[in-house]
């Protein structure tokens, strides 16, 4: 018994493009759920590995901050969101992300979305080319 497998070049290209779409979706900053201290629009607690969202008080990393402390830090941080602020609350130092960092975050997310949409378009073109 002989097993014959027909491999078409168009199918290989289609699978490669589909793989690129999946990889770009998983590792794109637009779809990533990773919280990075250097590119997160929230409060970064230096030396503790803790990151706190300004709006929801959600804490990521090794955080154990009481809610009233988080609220007081957030109120100070949101007043002057366009500059670096160093606030002392006990031993906690807060750094608010600057405007240039925020623009960089937006641009990197838009770039990730553009790459994702380009891969979708490329996969559609290859699919229509293969099935014409």
From Swiss-Prot:
- Major subcellular location class: host cell
Disulfide bridge map: none
Write out the GO cellular component annotations.
host cell endoplasmic reticulum membrane; host cell plasmodesma; membrane
* Any Pfam family: BNYVV_TGB3
Q: Which residues cross the membrane?
A: 12-32, 110-130
Which compartment or compartments is the protein found in?
Host cell junction, Host plasmodesma; Host endoplasmic reticulum membrane
Question: Topological domain, Cytoplasmic: which ranges?
Answer: 1-11, 131-132
Is this entry keyworded Transport? yes
Keyword annotations for this protein, in alphabetical order, are: Host cell junction, Host endoplasmic reticulum, Host membrane, Membrane, Transmembrane, Transmembrane helix, Transport, Viral movement protein
The topology of this chain with respect to the membrane is: Multi-pass membrane protein
Which InterPro entries is this protein grouped with?
A: BNYVV_TGB3
Which residues are exposed on the Lumenal face of the membrane?
33-109
A single BP term in Gene Ontology? transport of virus in host, cell to cell
Q: Hey, which family's this protein in? A: Belongs to the benyvirus TGB3 movement protein family.
Q: What does this protein do?
A: Participates in the transport of viral RNA to the plasmodesmata. TGBp3 most probably contains signals of plasmodesmata targeting is therefore involved in the targeting of TGBp2, and viral RNAs-TGBp1 (RNP complex), to plasmodesmata. Can gate plasmodesmata and increase their size exclusion limit.
Q: What is said about its interaction partners and assembly?
A: Interacts with movement proteins TGB1 and TGB2.
- Protein name as it appears in the record: Movement protein TGB3
This chain's source organism reads: Beet necrotic yellow vein virus (isolate Japan/S)
**Lineage per the UniProt record:** Viruses, Riboviria, Orthornavirae, Kitrinoviricota, Alsuviricetes
């Amino acid at each position: 018994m002989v097993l014959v497998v027909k491999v078409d070049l168009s199918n290989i290209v289609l699978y490669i493009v589909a793989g690129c779409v999946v990889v770009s979706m998983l590792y794109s900053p637009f779809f990533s759920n990773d919280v990075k201290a250097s590119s997160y629009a929230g409060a970064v607690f230096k030396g503790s590995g803790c990151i706190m969202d300004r709006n929801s008080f959600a804490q990521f990393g090794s955080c154990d901050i009481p809610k009233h402390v988080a609220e007081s830090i957030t109120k100070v941080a949101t007043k002057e969101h366009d500059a670096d602020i160093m606030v002392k609350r006990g031993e906690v130092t807060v750094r608010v992300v600057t405007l240039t960092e925020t623009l960089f975050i937006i641009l990197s997310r838009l770039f990730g979305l553009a790459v994702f949409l380009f891969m979708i378009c490329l996969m559609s073109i290859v699919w229509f080319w293969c099935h014409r």
